[in-house]
Amino acid sequence: MTELRQRAVREDAPPEDKESESEAKLDGETASDSESRAETAPPPTSIDDTPEVLNRALSNLSSRWKNWWVRGILTMAMIAFFFIIIYLGPMVLMMIVMCVQIKCFHEIITIGYNVYHSYDLPWFRTLSWYFLLCVNYFFYGETVTDYFFTLVQREEPLRILSKYHRFISFTLYLTGFCMFVLSLVKKHYRLQFYMFGWTHVTLLIVVTQSHLVIHNLFEGMIWFIVPISCVICNDIMAYMFGFFFGRTPLIKLSPKKTWEGFIGGFFATVVFGLLLSYVMSGYRCFVCPVEYNNDTNSFTVDCEPSDLFRLQEYNIPGVIQSLVGWKTMRMYPFQIHSALSTFASLIGPFGGFFASGFKRAFKIKDFANTIPGHGGIMDRFDCQYLMATFVNVYIASFIRGPNPSKLIQQFLTLRPDQQLHIFNTLKSHLTDKGILMSALEEE
């Protein structure tokens, strides 16, 4: 009798309630079914994406050594490409960073699309790329305003875009937000919000951190090259130590990682970071901030190096003196800051472990098959993004000070009466300190 009464109540329920119940049920089935399918799916099979030339040349080797040579050859090719783009200068580097960012975004969004494409979500891919455009417009607009200030103030259209940049950015994002709301359809509400969150988390991880990479680049190419090179060195040396000496598994998320590779990569990266920092600190083109020259309409990297990049003498602790026989040693202060290579080798790999967990959750081996033996672009940059964020925070906390050129640029945009007020205030301050009179006497 109780069951009959409950059935009668359900049958007497309004149509709207019935629809909402069925919709909630379908949403629940959608989420749970997709999760169960992901959990019960077979392990990913390895796809041989090795070029045919290498396949023929390495056909007599075992799969282990074949993978060693494929990874090694492609790694050398990528390092050569890295040297070429460094030679081409900061503008090319900035464009490469943007291209890498777009490719990484594409790889992550494609995974989501492949998982849920059977549900035919409306506008999912279109809105994902639209939000990427909006966020890039915001961040790159901020960068252009900050580092191309004189150029922006000189051109009327750019000045207007700069003045209302944040309002325009917000309007663009709001348009995408409204488009998403209008695209919501019954039976897919929960799934559509899943993908909305997926897109925004991807934007946070990829676009925001690539923007920080560009900021590091403008602080001086050394802040761009050394951190990236340390991560590359750690990847290579950890793989080599693990390949030859690896016996003890490091973490379940990535079974091929070993403690031997982790420790060997750590020491090799620290030594490499110190040596690379010493070499690069002697060149102005690497240590000077990248600035826009209004007269030549180009970037310049010429300056008087700061104390951070001038050789100084340091006393060696007594314990070490007895071992090496030296009382003092000359080194660049930047080499002390190159201890950030410690971060690259101790914390940086956790970016890779995070990516491994993500791939295991979706039963995929790599983000893509862009680079034979390595996977996708995101497989190569999972540690780089974490490193870029750390370097940017490190510079802001311990290195960066007021930038005189930027202050002068802002000063020149003020009204004449405001400029005169600042001039008189500065003159009074320098006179009270005795700095102005001393400068006049020296002249």
Swiss-Prot record:
What's its top-level EC category? transferase
What does the UniProt keyword field contain? Endoplasmic reticulum, Lipid biosynthesis, Lipid metabolism, Membrane, Nucleotidyltransferase, Phospholipid biosynthesis, Phospholipid metabolism, Phosphoprotein, Transferase, Transmembrane, Transmembrane helix
Note whether Nucleotide-binding occurs among the keywords. Answer: no
Q: What is its main location?
A: endoplasmic reticulum
**Which GO BP terms, alphabetically?**
CDP-diacylglycerol biosynthetic process; lipid droplet formation
**What residues bear Phosphothreonine in this entry?**
T30, T50
Entry's EC annotation: 2.7.7.41
UniProt modified residues of type Phosphoserine: S20, S32, S34, S36
Quote the function comment for this protein: Catalyzes the conversion of phosphatidic acid (PA) to CDP-diacylglycerol (CDP-DAG), an essential intermediate in the synthesis of phosphatidylglycerol, cardiolipin and phosphatidylinositol. Exhibits specificity for the nature of the acyl chains at the sn-1 and sn-2 positions in the substrate, PA and the preferred acyl chain composition is 1-stearoyl-2-arachidonoyl-sn-phosphatidic acid. Plays an important role in regulating the growth and maturation of lipid droplets which are storage organelles at the center of lipid and energy homeostasis.
Protein's name according to its UniProt entry: Phosphatidate cytidylyltransferase 2
